[in-house]
């Protein structure tokens, strides 16, 4: 009888133990209270991640004396009736079927009254903490102050809780715009709202934030690497600095994870609290922020501080600290030998065997540490950046661009280079472009083109490299640039949808391909010519397929409206869509292409009239469609039907704001005449100036 095939050795044994432990975790009920991470023993360390000799990593000691007690206080559980009520309230807020803002405000007040005395229970509840986040995001400053006051005295435990920490985050973000407001008198609110007997808190929001700092004081070193508290600490630091807190932005130093946006979509833009712009702060906040930043790192020596750069939880907090130190307190703070940036990088020259050069080289290829290096490069003083670029990055920028992780550091570097250094970097990266395109690493060429346009660097060598990397046939070239698949048969398309229906990797590659093509169109000369010639070579069916593609259609829109688009190209290209306008206008993506045809034919009025007549023939069909009605409105088709003369004036771009007396845009011959007249006027003045 054949024996079962089994793996032998220490790694197989460790793998079986891990699988058993994983099954046990899946079967056990999840503890609702946040637990402190236990330090991994030597037996539990993954053999693939063993700490080799000389590695720039030192594990943090979890059993620190300054850490808070490990037992989490229990605030109680909601009974079944309370859970049912809050679940229904959550559904009502999700549906957002309120007639007006006043009705929604009354409903939120009723939920707050029901939650009175149970706020901590709701915040720590797995099923109801999301409701608390929604309530906070929809609350006014009076309600936020009251809830903030209920949390005071418990923040040390709440920020470490798996669910309550999110509520603290949302509370800090929404309370930030009110830190400079004065405390309203309690009598005034009692007069306004007779039904509400709850007393107003005596503390202002600024004073409440200071209370939070007092509660957390002495535990900063531990909270720095606490898996739940670290997120809240980052938000708190940015609020104290008055910096924008925008979790949805990819460039935000606080957005290191995917965050659900739990706010309710409203039609009134005034109801949304602005958190994406700098906020005014009290004077006391700045001194408090300096003290917090000093206390956070004072207990760590330089070795541990550098090890924090590769810590998955501590690294984002360190990013915020470095960002605030360099941008908020001025780059002159980098000269202080006790500053964070100086403790990480003690020297300016980055010599071969210096501590700073060794530290930076260790971060270049680290998936976690490279994010800190991006923040440092973006914010560091110019003198320090020049030394870093000259001694660490310049000679190896081509090989760094090939790497998946170090490539992002290269992007931040390109953004800071001057014209001469950018020219040299372009020459080093250009030979790597075929390999980057083959592996779909398209961000580096895209950013390189953008920076060359900003600095005025010649892009002809980039155009040659891109042309050599793609097919010589212009039709095939566009398919390669945009990652367009050949048209499959019906059976093949059904099988492909079943197999790769949600392939996010392919969608991301198509997005970056489209962005690269759009960037190429902004560059005058050969770079944009590669895309323009490929678009003109496409058949009508192929253009329709591209126009209906949500990602690729952006390239057509860009080609029709960008400044490098010539009148000759638009005259040839726009006529390719005649006869298919209604089909495109009824498509979600194609309708945007039809909208782009309006500005593209501003100097081609005869083509625009032909297109308008085609749309008019299918008026009923367009009016029955949501996107069709948008196209009808954007093309001013009602004006075309009733007042054809006014429509023609609008089609030519004549501004008729001043009582119908508009100014016609100057044609090419008018511009040439004006230029010749100005030159003649200068020549006539020249002899007079010489005599004087």
Swiss-Prot record:
Region spans: Disordered = 1-69, 181-201, 485-508
Which keywords does UniProt give here?
Nucleus, Repeat, Ribosome biogenesis, rRNA processing
A molecular function (GO) term: RNA binding
- Feature: compositional bias, Basic and acidic residues: 11-27
Q: Name one GO biological process term.
A: ribosomal small subunit export from nucleus
Give the location in the cell.
Nucleus, Nucleolus
Q: In which ranges do the Pumilio repeats occur?
A: 114-149, 355-390, 391-431, 534-574, 576-613
Q: Name one GO cellular component term.
A: preribosome, small subunit precursor
Q: Where is the composition biased (Basic residues)?
A: 1-10
Function, as annotated, reads: RNA-binding nucleolar protein required for pre-rRNA processing. Involved in production of 18S rRNA and assembly of small ribosomal subunit.
Q: Which family does it belong to?
A: Belongs to the NOP9 family.
| Annotated protein name in UniProt | Nucleolar protein 9
Q: Please tell me the species this chain comes from.
A: Aspergillus clavatus (strain ATCC 1007 / CBS 513.65 / DSM 816 / NCTC 3887 / NRRL 1 / QM 1276 / 107)
């Amino acid at each position: 009888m054949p024996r079962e095939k089994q793996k032998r050795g220490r790694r197989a044994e460790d793998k079986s133990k891990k699988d058993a432990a994983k099954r046990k975790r899946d079967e056990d009920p999840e503890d609702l209270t946040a637990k402190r991470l236990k330090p991994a023993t030597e037996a539990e360390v993954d053999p693939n991640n063993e700490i080799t000799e000389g590695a720039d990593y030192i594990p943090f000691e979890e059993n620190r004396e300054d850490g808070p007690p490990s037992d989490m206080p229990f605030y109680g559980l909601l009974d079944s009736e309370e859970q049912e009520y809050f679940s229904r309230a959550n559904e009502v807020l999700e549906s957002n079927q309120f007639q007006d803002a006043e009705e929604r405000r009354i409903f939120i007040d009723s939920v707050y009254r029901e939650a009175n005395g149970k706020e901590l229970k709701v915040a720590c509840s797995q099923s109801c903490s999301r409701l608390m986040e929604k309530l906070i995001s929809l609350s006014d400053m009076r309600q936020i102050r009251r809830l903030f006051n209920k949390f005071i005295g418990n923040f040390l435990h709440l920020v470490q809780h798996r669910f309550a920490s999110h509520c603290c985050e949302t509370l800090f973000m929404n309370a930030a715009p009110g830190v400079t407001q004065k405390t309203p008198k309690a009598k005034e609110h009692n007069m306004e709202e007779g039904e509400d007997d709850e007393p107003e808190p005596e503390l202002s929001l600024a004073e409440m934030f200071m209370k939070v700092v007092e509660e957390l004081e002495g535990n900063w070193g531990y909270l720095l690497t606490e898996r739940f508290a670290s997120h809240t600490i980052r938000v708190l630091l940015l609020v104290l600095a008055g910096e924008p807190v925008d979790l949805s932005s990819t460039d935000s130093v606080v957005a290191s994870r995917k965050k659900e946006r739990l706010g309710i979509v409203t039609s009134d833009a005034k109801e949304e609290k602005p958190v994406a712009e700098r906020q005014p702060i009290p004077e006391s906040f700045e001194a408090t922020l300096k003290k917090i930043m000093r206390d956070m790192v004072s207990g760590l020596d330089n070795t541990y501080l550098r090890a924090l750069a590769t810590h998955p939880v501590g690294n984002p907090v360190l990013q915020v600290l470095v960002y605030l130190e360099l941008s908020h307190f001025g780059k002159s703070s980098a000269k202080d030998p006790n500053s964070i940036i100086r403790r990480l990088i003690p020297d300016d020259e980055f010599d071969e065997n210096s501590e700073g050069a060794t530290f930076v080289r260790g971060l270049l290829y680290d998936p976690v540490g490279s994010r800190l290096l991006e923040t440092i490069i973006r914010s560091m003083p110019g003198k320090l950046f020049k030394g870093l670029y000259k001694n660490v990055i310049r000679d190896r920028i081509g090989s760094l661009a090939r790497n998946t992780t170090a490539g992002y550091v290269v992007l931040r570097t390109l953004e800071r280079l001057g014209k001469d250094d950018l020219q040299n970097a372009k020459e080093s990266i250009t030979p790597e472009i075929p390999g980057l395109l083959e592996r779909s690493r398209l961000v580096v060429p895209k950013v390189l083109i953008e920076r060359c346009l900003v600095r005025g660097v010649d892009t002809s060598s980039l155009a040659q490299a891109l042309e050599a990397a793609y097919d010589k046939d212009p039709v095939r070239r566009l398919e390669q640039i945009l990652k367009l698949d050949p048209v499959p048969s019906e059976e093949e398309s059904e099988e492909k949808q079943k197999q790769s229906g949600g392939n996010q990797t392919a969608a991301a590659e198509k997005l970056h391909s489209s962005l690269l093509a759009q960037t190429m169109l902004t560059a005058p000369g050969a770079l944009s010519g590669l895309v323009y010639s490929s678009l003109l070579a496409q058949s009508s069916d192929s253009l329709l397929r591209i126009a209906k593609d949500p990602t690729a259609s952006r390239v057509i829109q860009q080609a029709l409206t960008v400044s490098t688009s010539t009148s000759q190209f638009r005259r040839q290209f726009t006529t390719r869509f005649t006869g298919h306008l209604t089909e495109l206008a009824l498509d979600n993506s194609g309708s945007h292409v039809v909208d782009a045809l309006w500005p593209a034919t501003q100097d081609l009025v005869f083509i625009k009239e032909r297109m308008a007549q085609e749309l008019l023939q299918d008026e009923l069909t367009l009016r029955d469609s949501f996107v069709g009605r948008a196209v009808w409105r954007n093309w001013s088709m009602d004006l075309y039907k009733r007042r054809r003369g006014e429509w023609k004036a609008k089609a030519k771009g004549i501004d008729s704001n001043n009582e119908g007396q508009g100014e016609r845009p100057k044609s090419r011959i008018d511009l040439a005449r004006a230029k010749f007249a100005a030159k003649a006027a200068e020549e006539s003045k020249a002899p007079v100036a010489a005599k004087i």
